[in-house]
Swiss-Prot record:
Record organism: Corynebacterium lipophiloflavum (strain ATCC 700352 / DSM 44291 / CCUG 37336 / JCM 10383 / DMMZ 1944)
Record's protein name: Lantibiotic flavucin
Propiece span(s): 1-20
Keyword field: Antibiotic, Antimicrobial, Bacteriocin, Lantibiotic, Thioether bond
Residue ranges the record marks as coiled coil: none
Length: 51
């Protein structure tokens, strides 16, 4: 079972389609990485950007 729902929805224009990506993870709802970025201290997404 995937952590993401990759659903497509029609846009405002007749010929356009836009993806609707949502996380199913309970720890990080809406986080694009799902449970892999689960941070139990902040209860949300956490990203580390380094060189």
């Amino acid at each position: 079972m995937s952590d993401f729902t990759l659903d497509f929805a029609e846009g405002d224009a007749a010929d356009t389609v836009s993806p609707q990506i949502t996380s199913k993870s309970l720890c990080t709802p809406g986080c694009i990485t799902g449970w892999m970025m689960c941070n139990t201290v902040t209860k949300g997404c956490s990203f580390t950007i380094g060189k």
